[in-house]
């Protein structure tokens, strides 16, 4: 995420969409947490959608941050959803405490990426 910032888009229906990119590691934890807290506490959109379609990796700190964002959203009456994650990241988010009903549009890995390489 350090190389590419989080894109923020406001939809006509009142949803705020956050789109991080690439591998999100420990160096990105503070920035991601600040964006999420600002969105939930100050912007207070109808819905906060974390679009992870372009995220290849989430470290444990940021997995916990996304799980905590769901609880923070509940406290502030903001529905938080996670869209477009890979199956692997969706499983990690579920293990970190993100309720299954918050995960939408889970994507299959590309066949080229999941196929064993020829020898």
How would you name each of these model-derived features?
Residues 1-57, 61, 67-119:
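STAS-like cytosolic regulatory interaction modules
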């Amino acid at each position: 995420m350090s190389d590419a910032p989080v894109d923020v888009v406001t939809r006509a229906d009142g949803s705020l969409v956050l789109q991080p990119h690439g591998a999100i590691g420990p160096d990105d934890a503070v920035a991601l947490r600040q964006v999420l807290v600002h969105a939930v506490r100050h912007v207070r959109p109808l819905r906060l959608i974390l679009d992870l379609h372009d995220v290849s990796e989430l470290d444990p700190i940021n997995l916990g941050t996304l799980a905590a964002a769901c609880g923070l959203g509940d406290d502030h009456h903001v529905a938080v959803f996670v869209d477009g994650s890979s199956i692997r990241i969706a499983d990690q988010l579920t293990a970190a405490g993100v309720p299954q009903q918050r995960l939408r549009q889970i994507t299959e890995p590309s066949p080229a990426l999941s196929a064993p390489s020829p020898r």
